[in-house]
C-alpha cells in the first residue's frame, strides 16, 4: 500500500500531526494508499519554499532557460505516463482524456506550448510627445506574479493540474498545488518528474488534504500567496473568492455548469450522436464541459433519442484493465450516493427513463465500486432539479424544441455559462446561434476540441477570468509600465 506524502522544496514530507486519510479505488472500494493530511505547518512550509525559490535560480532564469526545463518536464510525463494512469486508478489502461484520442499529448502540451508561447510574446511600447519636444518612451515589461495557489479537481487530475501549473511556471512563478483528496498521487508523481527535469527545489510544491479546516482552507487563507487558480464547484469558488479578498489577491475560477447541447434537424446525425455520446458519458459523465441538457429539434427528436439510447446501451461497463471496457466508475462513493439520488428524483418528477437509471450488477470483486448506469431521460419539466442542477454523472435529459429562438432561450435559461455544443450543417445558423449562447466556450459540430492558444473559462456562475494562450500570460504575470523621458 502506498504512503502518499507532501512534496515540499524538492522533498517528500510527512505531516507533523501524523494525520492520514485513505485513498480508495473507485473500481472496487478497496484502500490503495494512505495520504498525509497537511496542517497549517506543512502549508506554510510549502508557501515559504515557493517564496524562497522565487528569489533563487528560477527567478533569475531567462524565458528560454525555463522553457528548456519545461520541455524536459513534458518529456518526463511521456516517459512515465503509465505511472500517471496507475496513480489515478490501479490497473487503468486508458488516459483520463474524456474520450479524446490524443491521450497524453495535451498534458505534454500544457508545458511545451506555454513555454514556447512566452518566447514569442512581444511587449508593448509607445512613444509620446512632451512639452519640451524631446519626447518619452513608455514600454511594458511582464514579471512573475509570485506564489500561485493551484487548487485542482479530481475528474481530469493530470490534465487540469498541468493546464494551470504549465503556464504558471513558464511565466516564472512558483506554485503550491492542493490536488483533490480523491486523486492525490498524480500531483506528487509530477513532483518527481519536475525534480528529474531540473526544476529547482521549491518551484513546485504539493500539499494534500481537504477543503474546510484542512489544506485547502489553510492555503487560501495564507497571506503570502499572491493569486489562486481553481477548478471545481461554484460554492467552493465563492469561498476562495472571499478568502482571496483579504489582501486583494487575484483569482481565476473555472466553476460548475449545466451545459446545453443543441441539435438542429439539419445536423449530420452520425456526428451529432457520436459527439453527444461523448459529451454526456465520457469519463463517466465527470467532465465540467459535458452536456447534461440536450435540446433536439422536433422533426428528428424521436430518431435522435432512439440512436442515443442505442449508443448508450452499447457502452461496455468494466474495470480499468478490461481492454474492451469503455465506461468506468465514478470517482468515489460520495458521487456514487449523489448521482443515484438524481436518478430517483427524475422518476419522482415524472421522467421517462429511456435507458439506465440505476446501478449495474457487477462481479463480486467489483461490487464495492462506485458504479452507475449511463442514463437518458425525456419528459421532465424545465424547472426540475434534474434539469437545472449539475449532477456530474453519466446522464442527460433530452427535450424537443420548435424554433431557433426557443433553443437559444432554453440554453440560456440557467445561471451557468461554461460551455455549449451546437450541431448543424447550416454555417450561418451556427455563427448566429453561437453568438447568442451565454457561455465561455461554444463548439460547433464538435465537443472538447481544444487549442491551448485560445481563451478558456465560463460566464455567469461558471467562472471568472480566462486562461489559455495570452490570457494565461495576463493572469500569471504583472504588467509594469516604464516611462523614460528622452
UniProtKB/Swiss-Prot annotation:
pH dependency: Optimum pH is 8.3 for the oxidation of 2-hydroxymuconic semialdehyde, and 9.6 for that of benzaldehyde.
Q: Active site located where?
A: 254, 288
Query: Does the keyword field hold Flavoprotein?
Result: no
Q: Which reactions fall under this protein's catalytic activity?
A: (2Z,4E)-2-hydroxy-6-oxohexa-2,4-dienoate + NAD(+) + H2O = (2Z,4E)-2-hydroxyhexa-2,4-dienedioate + NADH + 2 H(+)
The UniProt keyword set, sorted, is:
Aromatic hydrocarbons catabolism, NAD, Oxidoreductase, Plasmid
List the EC numbers from the record: 1.2.1.85
Identify the pathway. Answer: Aromatic compound metabolism; benzoate degradation via hydroxylation
Record flagged with keyword Transmembrane = no
Gene Ontology MF term list: oxidoreductase activity, acting on the aldehyde or oxo group of donors, NAD or NADP as acceptor
Q: Which GO terms describe its biological process?
A: benzoate catabolic process via hydroxylation
Q: Which InterPro entries match?
A: Ald_DH/histidinol_DH, Ald_DH_C, Ald_DH_CS_CYS, Ald_DH_CS_GLU, Ald_DH_N, Aldehyde_DH_dom, OHmuconic_semiald_DH
Fetch the Pfam families from UniProt.
Aldedh (PF00171)
EC class (word)? oxidoreductase
Spans through the membrane:
none
Record text on subunit structure and interactions: Homodimer.
Provide the function of this protein. Answer: 2-hydroxymuconic acid semialdehyde can be converted to 2-hydroxypent-2,4-dienoate either directly by the action of 2-hydroxymuconic semialdehyde hydrolase (HMSH) or by the action of three sequential enzymes, the first of which is HMSD. Can oxidize not only 2-hydroxymuconic semialdehyde and its analogs but also benzaldehyde and its analogs.
Tell me which family the UniProt entry assigns to this protein.
Belongs to the aldehyde dehydrogenase family.
Name of the protein in its database record: 2-hydroxymuconic semialdehyde dehydrogenase
Query: What organism does the record attribute this protein to?
Result: Pseudomonas putida
Amino acid at each position: 500500500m502506498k504512503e502518499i506524502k507532501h512534496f515540499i522544496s524538492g522533498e517528500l514530507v510527512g505531516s507533523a500531526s501524523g494525520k492520514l486519510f485513505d485513498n480508495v479505488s473507485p473500481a472496487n472500494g478497496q484502500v490503495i494508499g494512505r495520504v498525509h493530511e497537511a496542517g497549517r505547518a506543512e502549508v506554510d512550509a510549502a508557501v515559504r519554499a515557493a517564496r524562497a525559490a522565487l528569489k533563487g535560480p528560477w527567478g533569475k532564469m531567462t524565458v528560454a532557460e525555463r522553457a528548456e526545463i519545461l520541455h524536459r518536464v513534458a518529456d518526463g510525463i511521456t516517459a512515465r505516463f503509465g505511472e500517471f494512469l496507475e496513480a489515478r486508478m490501479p490497473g487503468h489502461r486508458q488516459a483520463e482524456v474524456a474520450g479524446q484520442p490524443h491521450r497524453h499529448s495535451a498534458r505534454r502540451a500544457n508545458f511545451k506550448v506555454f513555454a514556447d508561447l512566452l518566447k514569442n510574446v512581444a511587449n508593448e511600447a509607445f512613444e509620446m510627445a512632451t512639452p519640451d519636444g524631446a519626447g518619452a518612451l513608455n514600454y511594458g515589461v511582464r514579471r512573475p506574479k509570485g506564489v500561485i495557489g493551484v487548487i485542482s479537481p479530481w475528474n481530469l487530475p493530470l490534465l487540469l493540474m498541468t493546464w494551470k501549473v504549465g503556464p504558471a511556471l513558464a511565466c516564472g512563478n512558483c506554485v503550491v498545488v492542493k490536488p483533490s483528496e480523491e486523486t492525490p498521487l498524480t500531483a506528487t508523481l509530477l513532483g518527481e518528474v519536475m525534480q528529474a527535469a531540473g526544476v529547482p527545489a521549491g518551484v513546485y510544491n504539493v500539499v494534500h488534504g481537504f477543503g474546510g479546516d484542512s489544506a485547502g482552507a489553510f492555503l487560501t487563507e495564507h497571506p503570502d500567496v499572491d493569486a489562486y487558480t481553481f477548478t471545481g464547484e461554484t460554492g467552493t469558488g465563492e469561498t476562495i473568492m472571499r478568502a482571496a479578498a483579504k489582501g486583494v489577491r487575484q483569482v481565476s475560477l473555472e466553476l460548475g455548469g449545466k451545459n446545453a447541447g443543441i441539435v438542429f434537424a439539419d445536423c449530420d446525425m452520425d456526428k451529432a450522436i457520436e459527439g453527444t455520446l461523448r459529451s454526456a458519458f465520457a469519463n463517466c459523465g465527470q467532465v465540467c464541459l459535458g452536456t447534461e441538457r440536450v435540446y433536439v429539434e422536433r422533426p428528428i427528436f424521436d430518431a435522435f433519442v432512439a440512436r442515443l439510447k442505442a449508443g448508450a446501451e452499447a457502452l461496455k461497463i468494466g474495470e480499468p484493465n478490461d481492454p474492451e471496457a469503455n465506461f468506468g466508475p465514478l470517482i468515489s462513493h460520495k458521487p456514487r450516493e449523489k448521482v443515484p439520488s438524481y436518478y430517483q428524483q427524475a422518476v419522482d418528477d415524472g421522467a421517462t427513463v429511456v435507458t439506465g437509471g440505476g446501478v449495474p450488477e457487477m462481479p463480486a470483486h467489483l461490487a464495492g465500486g462506485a458504479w452507475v448506469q449511463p442514463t437518458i431521460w425525456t419528459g421532465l419539466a424545465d424547472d426540475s432539479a434534474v434539469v437545472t442542477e449539475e449532477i456530474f454523472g453519466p446522464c442527460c435529459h433530452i427535450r424537443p424544441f420548435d424554433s431557433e429562438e426557443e433553443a437559444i432561450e432554453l440554453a440560456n435559461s440557467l445561471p451557468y455559462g461554461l460551455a455549449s455544443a451546437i450541431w448543424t450543417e447550416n454555417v450561418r445558423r451556427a455563427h448566429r446561434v453561437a453568438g447568442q449562447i451565454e457561455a465561455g466556450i461554444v463548439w460547433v459540430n464538435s465537443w472538447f476540441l481544444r487549442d491551448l492558444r485560445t481563451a478558456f473559462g465560463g460566464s455567469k456562475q461558471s467562472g471568472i477570468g480566462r486562461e489559455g494562450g495570452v490570457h494565461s500570460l495576463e493572469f500569471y504575470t504583472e504588467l509594469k509600465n516604464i516611462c523614460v523621458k528622452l
